[in-house]
């Protein structure tokens, strides 16, 4: 099974250097988001792809389907993880009833 990466150019470069051959770079332009959607659907349909890694930032721009295989995981990009920050804000909001904002 192959691993595929969908992300910004820096993230993709890092994964290519780590040996991932199926790595595709996208910007956040409308044209690239459309290309991203098409590539994600193409990778999901392929039987030789077992894991798809997509940066959190790009994952926010597309609908991630709920499929058993391939496994689709969100990874942070060079700006860091947003998921941990969101989870922490929700915990604080529930605990003290106040939403924290930057």
Swiss-Prot record:
Keywords recorded for this protein, A-Z: ATP synthesis, Cell membrane, Hydrogen ion transport, Ion transport, Membrane, Transport
Membrane topology term: Peripheral membrane protein
Protein name per UniProt: A-type ATP synthase subunit F
Assembly mode: Has multiple subunits with at least A(3), B(3), C, D, E, F, H, I and proteolipid K(x).
Coiled-coil intervals: none
InterPro entries to which the protein is assigned, alphabetical: ATPase_V1-cplx_f_g_su (IPR008218), ATPase_V1-cplx_fsu_bac/arc (IPR022944), ATPase_V1_fsu_sf (IPR036906)
UniProt cross-references to PANTHER family, sorted A to Z: V-TYPE PROTON ATPASE SUBUNIT F, VACUOLAR ATP SYNTHASE SUBUNIT F
Subcellular location: Cell membrane
GO molecular function terms noted in the UniProt entry: ATP binding; proton-transporting ATP synthase activity, rotational mechanism; proton-transporting ATPase activity, rotational mechanism
Role, per record: Component of the A-type ATP synthase that produces ATP from ADP in the presence of a proton gradient across the membrane.
